[in-house]
Amino acid sequence: MLILNGFSSATLALITPPFLPKGGKALSQSGPDGLASITLPLPISAERGFAPALALPYSSGGGNGPFGVGWSCATMSIARRTSHGVPQYNDSDEFLGPDGEVLVQTLSTGDAPNPVTCFAYGDVSFPQSYTVTRYQPRTESSFYRLEYWVGNSNGDDFWLLHDSNGILHLLGKTAAARLSDPQAASHTAQWLVEESVTPAGEHIYYSYLAENGDNVDLNGNEAGRDRSAMRYLSKVQYGNATPAADLYLWTSATPAVQWLFTLVFDYGERGVDPQVPPAFTAQNSWLARQDPFSLYNYGFEIRLLRLCRQVLMFHHFPDELGEADTLVSRLLLEYDENPIRTQLCAARTLAYEGDGYRRAPVNNMMPPPPPPPMMGGNSSRPKSKWAIVEESKQIQALRYYSAQGYSVINKYLRGDDYPETQAKETLLSRDYLSTNEPSDEEFKNAMSVYINDIAEGLSSLPETDHRVVYRGLKLDKPALSDVLKEYTTIVNIIIDKAFMSTSPDKAWINDTILNIYLEKGHKGRILGDVAHFKGEAEMLFPPNTKLKIESIVNCGSQDFASQLSKLRLSDDATADTNRIKRIINMRVLNS
Protein backbone atom coordinates (compact mmCIF):
# COMPACT_ATOMS: atom_id res chain seq x y z
CA MET A 1 0.00 0.00 0.00
CA LEU A 2 1.33 3.42 -1.00
CA ILE A 3 1.84 5.85 1.88
CA LEU A 4 2.12 9.42 0.55
CA ASN A 5 2.78 12.14 3.14
CA GLY A 6 1.23 9.93 5.80
CA PHE A 7 -1.96 9.08 3.88
CA SER A 8 -2.77 5.63 2.52
CA SER A 9 -3.70 5.02 -1.10
CA ALA A 10 -7.15 3.92 0.06
CA THR A 11 -7.70 7.32 1.65
CA LEU A 12 -6.32 9.20 -1.35
CA ALA A 13 -8.63 7.26 -3.66
CA LEU A 14 -11.61 8.88 -1.93
CA ILE A 15 -10.36 12.38 -2.68
CA THR A 16 -11.87 14.13 -5.68
CA PRO A 17 -9.02 15.65 -7.72
CA PRO A 18 -9.16 19.44 -7.34
CA PHE A 19 -9.89 21.87 -10.15
CA LEU A 20 -6.68 23.38 -11.48
CA PRO A 21 -6.69 26.45 -13.72
CA LYS A 22 -5.64 26.07 -17.32
CA GLY A 23 -1.97 26.43 -18.12
CA GLY A 24 -0.44 22.99 -18.53
CA LYS A 25 -0.73 21.48 -15.08
CA ALA A 26 -1.26 17.72 -15.00
CA LEU A 27 -2.30 15.69 -11.99
CA SER A 28 -1.83 11.93 -12.23
CA GLN A 29 -2.69 9.05 -9.99
CA SER A 30 -0.12 6.42 -9.09
CA GLY A 31 0.96 4.33 -12.07
CA PRO A 32 2.38 0.80 -12.16
CA ASP A 33 5.54 2.04 -10.44
CA GLY A 34 3.53 3.33 -7.48
CA LEU A 35 4.75 6.92 -7.90
CA ALA A 36 2.51 9.98 -7.71
CA SER A 37 3.29 12.93 -9.96
CA ILE A 38 2.13 16.43 -10.82
CA THR A 39 3.52 19.08 -13.16
CA LEU A 40 3.30 22.84 -12.70
CA PRO A 41 3.91 25.07 -15.73
CA LEU A 42 6.36 27.92 -15.54
CA PRO A 43 5.18 31.42 -16.55
CA ILE A 44 6.78 31.26 -20.00
CA SER A 45 5.50 33.65 -22.68
CA ALA A 46 5.05 32.24 -26.17
CA GLU A 47 7.48 33.53 -28.75
CA ARG A 48 7.65 32.94 -32.52
CA GLY A 49 7.43 29.21 -31.96
CA PHE A 50 10.80 28.82 -30.18
CA ALA A 51 10.55 29.21 -26.41
CA PRO A 52 12.19 27.20 -23.61
CA ALA A 53 10.43 23.90 -22.89
CA LEU A 54 10.69 24.01 -19.11
CA ALA A 55 8.26 22.99 -16.37
CA LEU A 56 8.26 22.10 -12.69
CA PRO A 57 7.47 18.38 -12.33
CA TYR A 58 7.04 16.47 -9.09
CA SER A 59 7.59 12.77 -8.44
CA SER A 60 7.08 11.11 -5.09
CA GLY A 61 10.23 9.12 -5.84
CA GLY A 62 12.36 12.19 -6.52
CA GLY A 63 15.18 13.41 -4.33
CA ASN A 64 15.98 16.79 -2.83
CA GLY A 65 17.01 19.78 -4.91
CA PRO A 66 16.66 23.55 -5.44
CA PHE A 67 12.85 23.19 -5.39
CA GLY A 68 12.55 20.95 -2.32
CA VAL A 69 11.96 17.22 -2.06
CA GLY A 70 10.54 15.61 -5.20
CA TRP A 71 10.49 18.75 -7.40
CA SER A 72 12.91 19.52 -10.21
CA CYS A 73 13.40 21.81 -13.19
CA ALA A 74 16.03 20.08 -15.27
CA THR A 75 17.56 21.59 -18.38
CA MET A 76 19.15 19.50 -21.12
CA SER A 77 22.45 18.04 -19.94
CA ILE A 78 25.07 15.37 -20.59
CA ALA A 79 26.76 13.69 -17.64
CA ARG A 80 29.31 11.03 -16.79
CA ARG A 81 27.77 7.70 -15.80
CA THR A 82 27.99 6.91 -12.07
CA SER A 83 25.85 3.76 -11.72
CA HIS A 84 28.98 1.58 -12.05
CA GLY A 85 31.14 3.67 -9.75
CA VAL A 86 32.84 7.02 -9.40
CA PRO A 87 34.07 8.38 -12.76
CA GLN A 88 37.82 8.15 -13.43
CA TYR A 89 37.79 11.19 -15.74
CA ASN A 90 39.57 9.36 -18.55
CA ASP A 91 38.64 7.39 -21.65
CA SER A 92 37.16 4.58 -19.54
CA ASP A 93 34.20 6.71 -18.45
CA GLU A 94 30.79 6.40 -20.06
CA PHE A 95 28.47 9.32 -20.79
CA LEU A 96 24.70 9.65 -20.42
CA GLY A 97 22.89 11.62 -23.12
CA PRO A 98 20.10 14.19 -22.64
CA ASP A 99 17.50 11.39 -22.54
CA GLY A 100 19.48 9.35 -19.99
CA GLU A 101 20.64 6.77 -22.54
CA VAL A 102 24.25 5.57 -22.46
CA LEU A 103 26.35 7.07 -25.27
CA VAL A 104 28.77 5.07 -27.39
CA GLN A 105 31.43 6.36 -29.75
CA THR A 106 30.41 6.27 -33.40
CA LEU A 107 32.48 3.91 -35.53
CA SER A 108 35.25 5.48 -37.59
CA THR A 109 35.25 4.83 -41.34
CA GLY A 110 37.35 5.97 -44.23
CA ASP A 111 34.64 8.34 -45.38
CA ALA A 112 33.80 9.54 -41.88
CA PRO A 113 36.81 9.31 -39.56
CA ASN A 114 36.15 9.63 -35.83
CA PRO A 115 37.57 11.61 -34.09
CA VAL A 116 38.57 14.56 -36.29
CA THR A 117 40.40 17.86 -35.72
CA CYS A 118 38.45 21.10 -36.29
CA PHE A 119 39.69 24.67 -36.58
CA ALA A 120 36.33 26.25 -37.47
CA TYR A 121 32.59 25.72 -37.53
CA GLY A 122 30.99 27.05 -40.69
CA ASP A 123 32.28 30.59 -41.17
CA VAL A 124 33.47 30.91 -37.56
CA SER A 125 37.19 30.32 -36.97
CA PHE A 126 38.56 29.33 -33.55
CA PRO A 127 41.77 30.52 -31.85
CA GLN A 128 42.69 26.88 -31.15
CA SER A 129 42.02 23.49 -32.69
CA TYR A 130 39.58 20.99 -31.19
CA THR A 131 39.47 17.22 -31.20
CA VAL A 132 35.87 16.33 -32.05
CA THR A 133 34.54 12.86 -31.25
CA ARG A 134 31.10 11.76 -32.42
CA TYR A 135 28.80 9.81 -30.10
CA GLN A 136 25.38 8.24 -30.45
CA PRO A 137 22.89 6.66 -28.02
CA ARG A 138 23.40 2.96 -27.40
CA THR A 139 19.71 2.51 -28.19
CA GLU A 140 18.80 4.88 -31.01
CA SER A 141 15.48 6.73 -30.77
CA SER A 142 16.14 10.45 -31.23
CA PHE A 143 18.40 10.38 -34.31
CA TYR A 144 20.54 13.34 -33.38
CA ARG A 145 24.24 13.92 -34.02
CA LEU A 146 26.27 14.38 -30.84
CA GLU A 147 29.83 15.72 -30.79
CA TYR A 148 32.28 15.97 -27.89
CA TRP A 149 34.72 18.85 -28.42
CA VAL A 150 38.02 19.06 -26.49
CA GLY A 151 40.37 22.03 -26.90
CA ASN A 152 43.90 21.00 -27.86
CA SER A 153 45.44 24.04 -26.14
CA ASN A 154 43.47 24.72 -22.95
CA GLY A 155 41.64 21.40 -22.56
CA ASP A 156 38.19 23.01 -22.32
CA ASP A 157 35.49 20.55 -23.33
CA PHE A 158 31.87 20.93 -24.40
CA TRP A 159 29.18 19.11 -26.37
CA LEU A 160 27.39 20.05 -29.58
CA LEU A 161 24.05 18.39 -30.33
CA HIS A 162 22.59 18.54 -33.85
CA ASP A 163 18.89 17.76 -33.41
CA SER A 164 16.91 16.00 -36.13
CA ASN A 165 14.75 19.13 -36.57
CA GLY A 166 17.78 21.28 -37.43
CA ILE A 167 18.13 22.94 -34.01
CA LEU A 168 21.67 23.18 -32.65
CA HIS A 169 22.29 22.89 -28.89
CA LEU A 170 25.55 23.87 -27.18
CA LEU A 171 26.22 22.33 -23.77
CA GLY A 172 28.89 23.43 -21.31
CA LYS A 173 30.68 25.84 -23.62
CA THR A 174 31.84 28.00 -20.71
CA ALA A 175 32.84 27.03 -17.18
CA ALA A 176 29.62 28.63 -15.90
CA ALA A 177 27.62 25.77 -17.45
CA ARG A 178 29.85 22.91 -16.28
CA LEU A 179 29.84 20.96 -13.00
CA SER A 180 33.51 20.31 -12.37
CA ASP A 181 35.76 19.34 -9.50
CA PRO A 182 36.87 22.63 -7.87
CA GLN A 183 40.29 21.05 -7.27
CA ALA A 184 40.64 19.78 -10.86
CA ALA A 185 38.86 21.89 -13.46
CA SER A 186 39.42 19.27 -16.17
CA HIS A 187 37.29 16.78 -14.22
CA THR A 188 33.92 17.83 -15.64
CA ALA A 189 31.03 15.70 -14.43
CA GLN A 190 28.10 17.39 -16.15
CA TRP A 191 27.60 19.74 -19.09
CA LEU A 192 24.48 21.95 -19.02
CA VAL A 193 22.76 23.38 -22.08
CA GLU A 194 23.93 26.94 -22.59
CA GLU A 195 22.57 28.00 -25.97
CA SER A 196 20.22 26.75 -28.69
CA VAL A 197 19.63 28.10 -32.21
CA THR A 198 17.11 27.21 -34.90
CA PRO A 199 17.77 27.18 -38.67
CA ALA A 200 15.85 30.49 -38.76
CA GLY A 201 18.37 32.15 -36.40
CA GLU A 202 16.24 32.17 -33.24
CA HIS A 203 18.24 31.70 -30.04
CA ILE A 204 17.71 30.66 -26.43
CA TYR A 205 20.47 31.47 -23.94
CA TYR A 206 20.72 29.84 -20.50
CA SER A 207 22.61 31.50 -17.62
CA TYR A 208 23.74 29.77 -14.43
CA LEU A 209 24.94 30.97 -11.03
CA ALA A 210 27.87 29.37 -9.24
CA GLU A 211 27.71 28.89 -5.48
CA ASN A 212 29.62 31.64 -3.64
CA GLY A 213 28.77 31.06 0.03
CA ASP A 214 26.82 34.32 0.53
CA ASN A 215 24.58 34.34 3.63
CA VAL A 216 25.93 30.93 4.68
CA ASP A 217 27.19 30.37 8.23
CA LEU A 218 30.72 29.13 7.54
CA ASN A 219 31.11 27.65 11.02
CA GLY A 220 30.17 24.19 12.22
CA ASN A 221 29.22 21.78 9.44
CA GLU A 222 30.03 24.33 6.75
CA ALA A 223 33.60 24.92 7.88
CA GLY A 224 36.28 23.81 5.43
CA ARG A 225 33.93 22.92 2.58
CA ASP A 226 34.49 23.87 -1.06
CA ARG A 227 31.01 24.82 -2.26
CA SER A 228 31.84 26.25 -5.67
CA ALA A 229 30.92 23.23 -7.82
CA MET A 230 27.13 23.66 -7.81
CA ARG A 231 25.36 25.50 -10.66
CA TYR A 232 21.87 27.01 -10.37
CA LEU A 233 19.75 27.99 -13.36
CA SER A 234 19.47 31.78 -13.18
CA LYS A 235 18.00 33.17 -16.42
CA VAL A 236 16.64 31.91 -19.71
CA GLN A 237 16.68 34.61 -22.39
CA TYR A 238 15.03 34.21 -25.78
CA GLY A 239 13.41 36.18 -28.57
CA ASN A 240 16.53 37.79 -30.05
CA ALA A 241 15.46 40.95 -31.89
CA THR A 242 17.84 40.26 -34.80
CA PRO A 243 18.18 36.72 -36.18
CA ALA A 244 21.66 35.19 -36.23
CA ALA A 245 22.58 31.91 -37.91
CA ASP A 246 25.63 31.13 -35.75
CA LEU A 247 25.75 30.38 -32.05
CA TYR A 248 26.65 33.51 -30.08
CA LEU A 249 28.91 31.52 -27.75
CA TRP A 250 31.27 30.65 -30.59
CA THR A 251 32.69 34.16 -30.31
CA SER A 252 31.57 35.54 -26.92
CA ALA A 253 31.27 34.14 -23.40
CA THR A 254 28.33 36.46 -22.64
CA PRO A 255 26.27 37.39 -25.73
CA ALA A 256 25.53 41.12 -26.00
CA VAL A 257 22.11 40.66 -27.57
CA GLN A 258 18.80 42.47 -27.34
CA TRP A 259 16.49 39.83 -25.86
CA LEU A 260 12.72 40.36 -25.85
CA PHE A 261 11.93 37.79 -23.15
CA THR A 262 13.67 36.73 -19.94
CA LEU A 263 12.63 33.97 -17.54
CA VAL A 264 14.27 34.64 -14.16
CA PHE A 265 14.82 32.04 -11.44
CA ASP A 266 15.09 33.93 -8.16
CA TYR A 267 16.74 32.43 -5.08
CA GLY A 268 15.74 35.19 -2.67
CA GLU A 269 17.64 38.08 -4.25
CA ARG A 270 14.51 40.11 -5.05
CA GLY A 271 12.12 39.62 -2.13
CA VAL A 272 9.01 37.43 -2.08
CA ASP A 273 6.30 39.78 -0.80
CA PRO A 274 3.31 39.00 -3.06
CA GLN A 275 2.23 42.64 -2.79
CA VAL A 276 5.49 43.94 -4.28
CA PRO A 277 6.43 43.18 -7.90
CA PRO A 278 10.10 42.15 -7.99
CA ALA A 279 12.62 44.15 -9.97
CA PHE A 280 14.47 42.66 -12.91
CA THR A 281 17.87 43.31 -11.35
CA ALA A 282 18.76 41.40 -8.19
CA GLN A 283 18.75 43.69 -5.16
CA ASN A 284 20.16 41.42 -2.44
CA SER A 285 22.31 38.34 -1.97
CA TRP A 286 20.55 35.02 -2.32
CA LEU A 287 19.22 33.25 0.76
CA ALA A 288 20.59 30.10 2.38
CA ARG A 289 18.27 27.14 2.85
CA GLN A 290 17.79 25.51 6.24
CA ASP A 291 18.50 21.96 5.03
CA PRO A 292 21.73 22.11 3.00
CA PHE A 293 22.95 18.78 1.66
CA SER A 294 25.71 17.39 -0.53
CA LEU A 295 26.10 14.96 -3.42
CA TYR A 296 29.30 12.95 -3.86
CA ASN A 297 28.48 10.59 -6.74
CA TYR A 298 30.98 12.29 -9.07
CA GLY A 299 33.90 11.95 -6.66
CA PHE A 300 33.79 15.51 -5.31
CA GLU A 301 31.33 17.46 -3.18
CA ILE A 302 28.40 19.25 -4.82
CA ARG A 303 26.87 21.31 -2.02
CA LEU A 304 23.26 22.55 -2.43
CA LEU A 305 22.60 25.63 -0.31
CA ARG A 306 19.77 27.42 -2.15
CA LEU A 307 16.05 27.21 -2.81
CA CYS A 308 14.33 28.74 -5.81
CA ARG A 309 11.84 31.18 -4.28
CA GLN A 310 10.05 32.35 -7.44
CA VAL A 311 10.11 32.27 -11.23
CA LEU A 312 9.53 35.59 -13.02
CA MET A 313 8.62 36.36 -16.63
CA PHE A 314 9.82 39.72 -17.98
CA HIS A 315 9.16 41.35 -21.36
CA HIS A 316 11.57 43.85 -22.88
CA PHE A 317 9.63 46.19 -25.18
CA PRO A 318 10.68 49.68 -24.02
CA ASP A 319 9.01 51.56 -26.88
CA GLU A 320 5.69 49.77 -26.54
CA LEU A 321 5.53 49.30 -22.76
CA GLY A 322 7.34 52.44 -21.62
CA GLU A 323 10.01 50.65 -19.57
CA ALA A 324 12.96 48.41 -20.30
CA ASP A 325 11.89 45.46 -18.12
CA THR A 326 8.20 44.70 -17.62
CA LEU A 327 7.08 41.97 -15.23
CA VAL A 328 4.09 40.13 -16.71
CA SER A 329 3.84 36.89 -14.75
CA ARG A 330 5.17 35.30 -11.60
CA LEU A 331 5.23 31.87 -9.99
CA LEU A 332 5.74 32.39 -6.26
CA LEU A 333 6.92 29.30 -4.36
CA GLU A 334 6.39 28.75 -0.64
CA TYR A 335 8.18 26.10 1.40
CA ASP A 336 7.77 24.27 4.66
CA GLU A 337 11.38 24.76 5.75
CA ASN A 338 13.22 23.05 8.57
CA PRO A 339 16.79 21.81 9.13
CA ILE A 340 15.80 18.21 8.29
CA ARG A 341 13.82 18.47 5.07
CA THR A 342 12.27 21.24 2.99
CA GLN A 343 9.05 20.67 1.07
CA LEU A 344 7.25 22.87 -1.43
CA CYS A 345 3.83 23.50 0.13
CA ALA A 346 2.25 26.16 -2.10
CA ALA A 347 2.69 27.80 -5.48
CA ARG A 348 0.95 31.02 -6.47
CA THR A 349 0.55 32.22 -10.02
CA LEU A 350 0.39 36.03 -10.17
CA ALA A 351 -0.32 37.97 -13.34
CA TYR A 352 0.23 41.67 -13.91
CA GLU A 353 -2.14 43.76 -16.00
CA GLY A 354 -1.14 46.27 -18.63
CA ASP A 355 -1.43 49.11 -16.12
CA GLY A 356 0.91 47.32 -13.74
CA TYR A 357 -1.81 46.22 -11.30
CA ARG A 358 -1.29 42.81 -9.71
CA ARG A 359 -4.17 40.39 -10.01
CA ALA A 360 -5.06 38.13 -7.10
CA PRO A 361 -2.83 35.04 -7.04
CA VAL A 362 -3.99 31.60 -8.08
CA ASN A 363 -3.27 28.68 -5.75
CA ASN A 364 -1.74 25.91 -7.85
CA MET A 365 -1.30 23.40 -5.07
CA MET A 366 -3.72 20.67 -4.02
CA PRO A 367 -4.89 21.29 -0.45
CA PRO A 368 -3.84 18.51 1.91
CA PRO A 369 -6.45 15.81 2.52
CA PRO A 370 -7.95 15.39 5.98
CA PRO A 371 -5.98 13.13 8.33
CA PRO A 372 -6.95 9.46 7.98
CA PRO A 373 -8.16 7.40 10.95
CA MET A 374 -5.47 5.55 12.87
CA MET A 375 -5.15 1.95 11.75
CA GLY A 376 -5.60 -0.50 14.64
CA GLY A 377 -5.26 -0.02 18.37
CA ASN A 378 -7.07 2.43 20.57
CA SER A 379 -6.68 5.93 19.23
CA SER A 380 -7.99 9.19 20.53
CA ARG A 381 -7.80 10.74 17.05
CA PRO A 382 -11.32 11.12 15.64
CA LYS A 383 -12.10 9.83 12.19
CA SER A 384 -11.95 12.54 9.57
CA LYS A 385 -15.15 13.61 7.90
CA TRP A 386 -15.70 15.44 4.65
CA ALA A 387 -17.84 18.54 4.93
CA ILE A 388 -20.13 19.10 1.96
CA VAL A 389 -20.43 22.81 1.28
CA GLU A 390 -22.94 24.00 -1.28
CA GLU A 391 -22.23 27.30 -3.00
CA SER A 392 -24.64 29.43 -4.94
CA LYS A 393 -24.09 29.89 -8.64
CA GLN A 394 -23.35 33.55 -7.95
CA ILE A 395 -20.52 32.74 -5.52
CA GLN A 396 -19.15 30.16 -7.98
CA ALA A 397 -19.17 32.82 -10.71
CA LEU A 398 -17.33 35.25 -8.43
CA ARG A 399 -14.75 32.62 -7.48
CA TYR A 400 -14.10 31.76 -11.14
CA TYR A 401 -13.81 35.46 -11.95
CA SER A 402 -11.11 35.90 -9.29
CA ALA A 403 -9.17 32.92 -10.67
CA GLN A 404 -9.07 33.55 -14.40
CA GLY A 405 -12.28 35.15 -15.67
CA TYR A 406 -11.35 38.73 -14.80
CA SER A 407 -9.35 39.47 -17.94
CA VAL A 408 -12.10 38.55 -20.41
CA ILE A 409 -14.91 40.12 -18.38
CA ASN A 410 -13.22 43.46 -17.76
CA LYS A 411 -12.09 43.86 -21.36
CA TYR A 412 -15.65 43.13 -22.46
CA LEU A 413 -17.13 45.65 -20.01
CA ARG A 414 -14.68 48.37 -21.07
CA GLY A 415 -15.39 47.83 -24.75
CA ASP A 416 -11.82 46.75 -25.45
CA ASP A 417 -10.76 43.93 -27.74
CA TYR A 418 -11.23 40.64 -25.91
CA PRO A 419 -10.63 36.96 -26.78
CA GLU A 420 -14.09 36.02 -28.02
CA THR A 421 -13.30 32.31 -28.28
CA GLN A 422 -12.11 32.24 -24.68
CA ALA A 423 -15.23 34.13 -23.60
CA LYS A 424 -17.48 31.57 -25.30
CA GLU A 425 -15.53 28.69 -23.76
CA THR A 426 -15.92 30.28 -20.33
CA LEU A 427 -19.67 30.72 -20.74
CA LEU A 428 -20.03 27.19 -22.08
CA SER A 429 -18.01 25.64 -19.25
CA ARG A 430 -20.01 27.60 -16.64
CA ASP A 431 -23.37 26.55 -18.19
CA TYR A 432 -24.29 30.03 -19.37
CA LEU A 433 -24.33 28.80 -22.98
CA SER A 434 -25.53 25.52 -24.45
CA THR A 435 -23.67 25.78 -27.75
CA ASN A 436 -20.20 26.90 -28.79
CA GLU A 437 -21.65 28.75 -31.79
CA PRO A 438 -24.25 31.06 -30.24
CA SER A 439 -25.88 33.92 -32.06
CA ASP A 440 -24.76 37.43 -31.20
CA GLU A 441 -27.92 37.94 -29.14
CA GLU A 442 -27.44 34.64 -27.25
CA PHE A 443 -23.83 35.52 -26.49
CA LYS A 444 -24.75 39.02 -25.31
CA ASN A 445 -27.51 37.71 -23.03
CA ALA A 446 -25.26 34.99 -21.59
CA MET A 447 -22.53 37.53 -20.82
CA SER A 448 -25.09 39.78 -19.14
CA VAL A 449 -26.34 36.94 -16.92
CA TYR A 450 -22.78 35.87 -16.06
CA ILE A 451 -21.75 39.43 -15.13
CA ASN A 452 -24.91 39.88 -13.04
CA ASP A 453 -24.13 36.65 -11.19
CA ILE A 454 -20.63 37.90 -10.39
CA ALA A 455 -22.05 41.20 -9.15
CA GLU A 456 -24.71 39.44 -7.04
CA GLY A 457 -22.11 37.12 -5.57
CA LEU A 458 -20.02 40.16 -4.69
CA SER A 459 -22.93 42.01 -3.08
CA SER A 460 -23.75 38.96 -0.94
CA LEU A 461 -20.43 39.28 0.88
CA PRO A 462 -20.41 41.15 4.21
CA GLU A 463 -19.74 44.88 4.38
CA THR A 464 -16.40 46.05 5.74
CA ASP A 465 -15.17 48.87 7.94
CA HIS A 466 -12.28 49.78 5.66
CA ARG A 467 -12.05 53.47 4.89
CA VAL A 468 -9.04 53.58 2.55
CA VAL A 469 -8.00 51.32 -0.33
CA TYR A 470 -5.16 51.56 -2.84
CA ARG A 471 -4.55 50.84 -6.48
CA GLY A 472 -1.26 51.21 -8.33
CA LEU A 473 -1.35 52.18 -12.00
CA LYS A 474 0.89 53.22 -14.85
CA LEU A 475 -0.27 56.55 -16.21
CA ASP A 476 2.87 57.95 -17.81
CA LYS A 477 1.86 56.35 -21.08
CA PRO A 478 -0.75 57.29 -22.25
CA ALA A 479 -0.61 60.82 -20.89
CA LEU A 480 -2.27 61.74 -17.61
CA SER A 481 -4.82 63.81 -19.55
CA ASP A 482 -6.35 60.53 -20.69
CA VAL A 483 -6.67 59.61 -16.99
CA LEU A 484 -7.45 55.93 -17.57
CA LYS A 485 -8.52 54.38 -20.85
CA GLU A 486 -10.98 52.10 -19.08
CA TYR A 487 -12.71 54.98 -17.29
CA THR A 488 -15.48 57.23 -18.55
CA THR A 489 -14.72 60.78 -17.37
CA ILE A 490 -17.31 63.42 -16.42
CA VAL A 491 -15.53 66.55 -15.21
CA ASN A 492 -13.75 65.25 -12.10
CA ILE A 493 -16.01 62.19 -11.76
CA ILE A 494 -14.72 58.97 -13.27
CA ILE A 495 -16.81 55.84 -13.77
CA ASP A 496 -15.10 52.49 -13.95
CA LYS A 497 -17.19 50.41 -16.33
CA ALA A 498 -15.51 47.17 -15.22
CA PHE A 499 -15.02 45.47 -11.86
CA MET A 500 -12.40 47.49 -9.98
CA SER A 501 -9.81 45.61 -7.96
CA THR A 502 -8.11 47.38 -5.03
CA SER A 503 -6.12 46.51 -1.93
CA PRO A 504 -7.10 47.61 1.58
CA ASP A 505 -3.83 46.23 2.90
CA LYS A 506 -0.87 47.99 1.28
CA ALA A 507 0.00 50.11 -1.71
CA TRP A 508 2.63 48.53 -3.92
CA ILE A 509 4.82 50.77 -5.95
CA ASN A 510 3.97 52.04 -9.42
CA ASP A 511 4.29 55.43 -11.09
CA THR A 512 0.78 56.42 -9.96
CA ILE A 513 -0.96 55.47 -6.73
CA LEU A 514 -4.70 55.89 -6.34
CA ASN A 515 -5.43 56.74 -2.70
CA ILE A 516 -9.15 55.96 -2.51
CA TYR A 517 -11.31 57.06 0.43
CA LEU A 518 -14.49 55.13 1.18
CA GLU A 519 -17.73 56.36 2.68
CA LYS A 520 -20.03 54.23 4.78
CA GLY A 521 -22.30 52.13 2.61
CA HIS A 522 -19.85 51.66 -0.27
CA LYS A 523 -20.27 48.54 -2.40
CA GLY A 524 -16.70 47.25 -2.23
CA ARG A 525 -16.28 43.82 -0.69
CA ILE A 526 -13.29 41.87 0.60
CA LEU A 527 -13.12 38.62 -1.39
CA GLY A 528 -11.42 36.73 1.44
CA ASP A 529 -12.26 33.02 1.36
CA VAL A 530 -14.39 33.45 -1.74
CA ALA A 531 -11.27 34.35 -3.71
CA HIS A 532 -9.71 31.50 -5.65
CA PHE A 533 -6.68 31.95 -3.40
CA LYS A 534 -8.12 31.86 0.07
CA GLY A 535 -7.68 34.90 2.27
CA GLU A 536 -6.39 37.21 -0.46
CA ALA A 537 -6.52 40.84 0.69
CA GLU A 538 -8.41 42.21 -2.29
CA MET A 539 -11.42 44.53 -2.26
CA LEU A 540 -13.49 44.32 -5.42
CA PHE A 541 -15.99 46.95 -6.56
CA PRO A 542 -18.88 46.28 -8.97
CA PRO A 543 -19.05 47.78 -12.47
CA ASN A 544 -19.90 51.46 -12.89
CA THR A 545 -18.38 52.49 -9.58
CA LYS A 546 -18.18 56.30 -9.43
CA LEU A 547 -15.08 57.99 -8.08
CA LYS A 548 -14.47 61.68 -7.54
CA ILE A 549 -10.97 63.04 -8.06
CA GLU A 550 -10.25 65.34 -5.13
CA SER A 551 -6.61 66.15 -5.85
CA ILE A 552 -3.63 65.13 -7.94
CA VAL A 553 -0.29 65.56 -6.19
CA ASN A 554 2.65 65.31 -8.56
CA CYS A 555 6.23 64.43 -7.73
CA GLY A 556 8.22 67.54 -6.85
CA SER A 557 5.26 69.49 -5.52
CA GLN A 558 5.31 70.92 -2.03
CA ASP A 559 2.84 68.40 -0.59
CA PHE A 560 4.17 65.28 -2.32
CA ALA A 561 6.59 64.10 0.40
CA SER A 562 4.01 64.66 3.11
CA GLN A 563 1.32 62.75 1.22
CA LEU A 564 3.71 59.93 0.38
CA SER A 565 4.64 59.47 4.03
CA LYS A 566 0.98 58.87 4.90
CA LEU A 567 0.55 55.96 2.49
CA ARG A 568 0.74 52.43 3.84
CA LEU A 569 3.41 51.15 1.48
CA SER A 570 4.44 47.54 1.05
CA ASP A 571 7.23 46.32 3.29
CA ASP A 572 9.84 46.05 0.53
CA ALA A 573 8.88 49.27 -1.24
CA THR A 574 10.89 51.81 0.71
CA ALA A 575 13.87 51.67 -1.65
CA ASP A 576 11.66 52.02 -4.72
CA THR A 577 9.54 55.06 -3.90
CA ASN A 578 11.34 57.11 -6.54
CA ARG A 579 9.16 55.31 -9.09
CA ILE A 580 6.09 57.15 -7.79
CA LYS A 581 5.34 60.14 -10.02
CA ARG A 582 1.97 61.17 -8.58
CA ILE A 583 -0.68 60.42 -5.99
CA ILE A 584 -4.33 60.75 -7.00
CA ASN A 585 -6.64 61.23 -4.04
CA MET A 586 -10.12 59.94 -4.86
CA ARG A 587 -13.39 59.20 -3.12
CA VAL A 588 -15.91 56.48 -3.95
CA LEU A 589 -19.38 57.94 -4.43
CA ASN A 590 -22.22 55.76 -3.20
CA SER A 591 -24.77 57.18 -5.61
UniProtKB/Swiss-Prot annotation:
Ways its activity is controlled: Inhibited by novobiocin.
One GO MF term: nucleotide binding
pH dependence as annotated: Optimum pH is 7-8.
Localization per record: Secreted
InterPro entries hit by this protein: ADP-ribosyltransferase, Sal_SpvB
Superkingdom of the source species: Bacteria
Pfam family, one: ADPrib_exo_Tox
Listed GO CC annotations: cytoplasm; extracellular region
EC number(s) on file: 2.4.2.31
Positions of NAD(+) binding: R414, R471, G472, L473, K474, L475, D476, K477, E538
Active site positions, chain numbering: R471, S501, E538
Chief location of this protein within or outside the cell: secreted
Gene Ontology BP, a term: symbiont-mediated perturbation of host actin cytoskeleton via inhibition of actin polymerization
Known catalytic reactions: L-arginyl-[protein] + NAD(+) = N(omega)-(ADP-D-ribosyl)-L-arginyl-[protein] + nicotinamide + H(+)
Keywords on record: Glycosyltransferase, NAD, NADP, Nucleotide-binding, Nucleotidyltransferase, Plasmid, Secreted, Toxin, Transferase, Virulence
Residue intervals of the TR mART core domain: 373-576
UniProt cross-references to PROSITE patterns, sorted A to Z: TR_MART
Family, as annotated: Belongs to the SpvB family.
Further remark: In Salmonella spp. the spv gene cluster is encoded on a highly transmissible plasmid.
Function noted in UniProt: Mono-ADP-ribosylates eukaryotic muscle and non-muscle actin on 'Arg-177'. ADP-ribosylates all actins tested, has more activity on nonmuscle beta/gamma-actin than on muscle alpha-actin. Prefers monomeric G-actin but can weakly ADP-ribosylate F-actin. ADP-ribosylation prevents the polymerization of G-actin to F-actin, causing actin filament depolymerization, destruction of the cytoskeleton and cytotoxicity. Does not possess NAD(+)-glycohydrolase activity, unlike most mART enzymes.
Annotated protein name in UniProt: Mono(ADP-ribosyl)transferase SpvB
Species the sequence originates in: Salmonella typhimurium
Top-level taxonomy: Bacteria, Pseudomonadati, Pseudomonadota, Gammaproteobacteria, Enterobacterales
